[in-house]
């Protein structure tokens, strides 16, 4: 597709008859499948039945999507109150990661209780998978030309030594923008590597998951400052508030669980 004189990628991957299939959905689905593969592989190594994470994904993904959408809609209610039919339209994006995370965690807690499996064990195994899904999922935002930062020049983007397809896709309505999707994606990919390395450190159970929350939240806090489409509550950027909250809560949980003996078991214990 061409916009002005700048070639750009089409957000529609293919058409199945009259129905368009968007890259956004394909990319999100790819992230889920790769994350599932990673979690299932590690789960088997630690004695978790192979179908455990398959079952969990079947419950958690739909609930996470619903919660991600509900979270987004709640903070954009003034618009959706006037356009209620758009509430169910997610083809253009509009899924908030923090909302999805809340839904996934709630589902995981309930699932772990029903199956009588340690939630913290499941959460630790799933942590790199969740972050991998987020890293891949940001490229869905790239295809939709959303979740970008403020205005920049083409020279600025070329100075980052980005490939032309990224530079061109950041040209929206006659203006170039910060590729904040890329900053967050790279930060998340680095976090996946960190979490995979920390598996070998045999941390106390639950601490790998808290490390994920802390790592992602640090990156998200700074990236959010560049974005132009932040969900707001008065003068506050909701994602930054959530990021600070998750960092503080994670640190408190680590300290309290260690002091109270709730974190005696280690990651590699079966």
Swiss-Prot record:
- What is the predominant subcellular site recorded for this chain? membrane
Q: Name one GO biological process term.
A: lipoprotein biosynthetic process
Broad enzyme group: transferase
Q: What membrane topology term does the record carry?
A: Multi-pass membrane protein
What EC number(s) does its UniProt record assign?
Answer: 2.5.1.145
The alphabetized UniProt keywords are: Cell membrane, Membrane, Transferase, Transmembrane, Transmembrane helix
The molecular function GO annotations come to: phosphatidylglycerol-prolipoprotein diacylglyceryl transferase activity
Pathway where this protein functions:
Protein modification; lipoprotein biosynthesis (diacylglyceryl transfer)
Name its cellular compartments.
Cell membrane
Ligand binding (a 1,2-diacyl-sn-glycero-3-phospho-(1'-sn-glycerol)): 138
- Asked if the keyword Metal-binding belongs to this entry, the reply reads no
What is a single cellular component term in the Gene Ontology annotation?
plasma membrane
Q: Does the keyword Cell wall biogenesis/degradation apply?
A: no
State which residue ranges cross the membrane.
19-39, 53-73, 92-112, 117-137, 178-198, 206-226, 236-256
**Matches recorded under InterPro entries:** Lgt (IPR001640)
What family is reported?
A: Belongs to the Lgt family.
**Cited function:** Catalyzes the transfer of the diacylglyceryl group from phosphatidylglycerol to the sulfhydryl group of the N-terminal cysteine of a prolipoprotein, the first step in the formation of mature lipoproteins.
Query: Which protein are we looking at?
Result: Phosphatidylglycerol--prolipoprotein diacylglyceryl transferase
The gene coding this protein = lgt
């Amino acid at each position: 597709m061409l916009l002005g004189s700048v070639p750009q990628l089409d957000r529609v991957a293919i058409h199945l008859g009259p129905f368009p299939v968007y890259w956004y959905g394909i990319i999100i689905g790819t992230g889920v499948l790769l994350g599932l593969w990673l979690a299932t592989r590690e789960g088997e190594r630690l004695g978790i039945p192979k179908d455990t994470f398959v079952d969990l994904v079947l419950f958690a993904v739909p609930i996470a999507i619903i919660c991600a959408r509900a979270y987004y809609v709640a903070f954009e209610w003034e618009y959706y109150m006037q356009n209620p039919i758009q509430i169910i339209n997610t083809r253009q994006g509009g899924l908030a990661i923090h909302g999805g995370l809340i839904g996934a965690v709630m589902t995981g807690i309930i699932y772990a209780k029903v199956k009588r499996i340690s939630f913290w064990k499941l959460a630790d195994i799933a942590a790199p998978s969740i972050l991998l899904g987020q890293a891949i999922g940001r490229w869905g935002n790239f295809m939709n030309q959303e979740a970008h930062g403020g205005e920049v020049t083409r020279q600025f983007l070329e100075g980052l030594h980005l490939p032309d397809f990224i530079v061109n896709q950041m040209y929206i309505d006659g203006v170039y923008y910060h590729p904040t999707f890329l900053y967050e994606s790279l930060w998340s990919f680095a976090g996946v590597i960190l979490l995979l390395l920390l598996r070998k450190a045999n941390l106390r159970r639950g601490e790998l998951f808290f490390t994920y929350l802390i790592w992602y939240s640090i990156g998200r806090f700074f990236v959010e400052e560049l974005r132009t489409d932040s969900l707001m509550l008065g003068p506050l950027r909701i994602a930054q508030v959530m990021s600070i909250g998750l960092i503080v809560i994670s640190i408190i949980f680590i300290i309290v669980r260690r002091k109270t003996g709730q974190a005696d078991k280690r990651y590699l214990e079966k």
